[in-house]
Amino acid sequence: MNFEISSSFSPTGDHPEAIAALSEGIKSGVPFQTLLGVTGSGKTFTIANVIKEVQRPTLILSHNKTLAAQLYSEFKAFFPNNAVEYFVSYYDYYQPEAYLPSTDTYIEKDLAINEEIDKLRLRATASLLSGRKDVIVVSSVSCLYGMADPTAFAEKVTHLERGMRIDRDKLLRRFVDALYVNNKLEFKSGCFRVNGDTVDIFPAIETFDGMAYRIEFWDDEIDRISSFNPLTGEEYDEQDELNIYPTNLFVTTQERINMAIGQIDVDLGTQVNFLKEIGKPFEAKRLYERVTFDLEMIRELGHCSGIENYSRYFDGRAAGDRPFCLLDYFPKDFLLVVDESHVTIPQIRAMYGGDYARKKNLVEYGFRLPSAMDNRPLTFDEFESLTPLGIYVSATPADYELIKSEGVVVEQVIRPTGLLDPIIDVRPSLNQIDDLMEEITQRSAKDERVLVTTLTKRMAEELTTYMTRMGVRCNYIHSDVDTLERVQIMDDLRNGLFDVLIGVNLLREGLDLPEVSLVAILDADKEGFLRSHRSLTQTAGRAARNVNGKVIFYADKITASMQQTMDETNRRREKQMAYNEAHGITPKQVMKNSVSMLAEKQQTAEPYAYIEPEPSLVADPVVQYMNRTQLEKAIERTRKQMTEAAKKLDFIEAAQFRDELVKLEDLLKTKKD
């Protein structure tokens, strides 16, 4: 099936040229291109049209799961009849195993898995292995972490056809090998049940369709395959064929398990002897005890805690070989799209180093075998070798993308709304606060919002305190404000509960605030990370969704970064104005409802200035005096709330419940029976 876009929009402005240039580049063999699109120019729509033109399976890479979820929703809407999949980390909460030698502290791995996301991941791999070409996978960098060998996974897929001859018991054994469970009492995803010559199976992947399947035998021949509602038993359509995929991405065979056990045992002896030779008898003893226990668990149950640290043995990889990952499931001619590439690429670069540093201590101090080092994300070089064709998407592409694209940069600066890049005004720092207060007064009178960026957290807090005393409704945001509160503050700004938001780094990608008409940058002439060309451009872009958008640089001199930002902004404005004049377009204010990411909680608070955050649940005196039974009930209730939030892909709220859960569990440990 081909990619077909379903949209009421048609390409306008720079869209046609950008779509044509990128599509032609891919068809003519240009390996890498950059889409330089300004804020609000419809970059996602352009990429969707490129995918339609080139008709290639596509991986869209985002730097966090929240933005990945937004992209997934958008592409799902553009391609309702194609396979648009979502692949992110399935952990609602994850504390990796670690050892801190300086304090002799061992931190055990702790996690909570989101089963619905696990099924979405499984569905993504199934779509890729199905052979269909109309597949789009929207993913976080989770796609670069280890997975099962795609060949071994494909071998566990059971293909059934009407009229096919297969022994029923042999089929049931294949289901068990694919980790399905025979369960007549609770027929759910990942289960099968047998009733004479009839076998019912509830595939893990088909959960989203609510379908189970009935396979009816006549002797050793499949006589009929039909779908049915697992709750009511109502039968639907008959099927000519059916693919049953494993319930887990890490499925393996008993033969591989036996081989792995033997190899682990040999490597254990080698590493224990090595630790003794270098004068670490205690570490050698610890390693022997831990790995021996793991081997017993694998022999008896087929798995153990931390089995991922032995993945090299189960995959049949040599020491140092890269792990298999989602990229191995794509055909060789797939298209990579890196969203917000100026952030995503550095994140990919850093992944391996962070993982290596943590694992190195675990191996050196006898907690893990050296094989744990091979359970890792891809190195950046490995990532590059697996992605020969790509498009980098950013309003401010970094040097890497520009060099990699070899000058093939496609601009998209015309917005469908006709909005222009904001005017940039440079003013002296003398009396800058008084001048800013006057600007804020003017904007507040028009029910518009203001963003102010400072260089330090202390400056942000002190400026907030000063403005509050002067009667300005304001709040501040910086790295010490947690993710949940940060999103709530953004919602409150949009909803008019305060007028001014002060922060250190307000250039966060995905920050969509059409009510903001003024961005004030204090100390704009202080060269550095927060005042680089890219940072200034990203921050200035926050005012680009408002028809009255304006940026003020408070500075006593014009730096190279400031000049570059102003020159680029003026160039874009001239092009945008010329286009609007030629086509009779009047800029229109972006009207966008404020949809809270916090499960649309009702905001009932009065408009406020700077206030202290509300105390957490654990700080409640009632909770402090709960007995063990009451605390256990509170823990269970909080865990359910966390799971429900995660099922809705509301990771921000799930994280809040997770933090409360950890605190409640810590409190429970202090209670005596």
What do these predicted regions represent?
Residues 1-2, 442, 578, 582-656, ...:
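Acidic, low-complexity intrinsically disordered tails
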Residues 1-595, 599-602, 642:
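ASCE RecA-like P-loop NTPase motor cores
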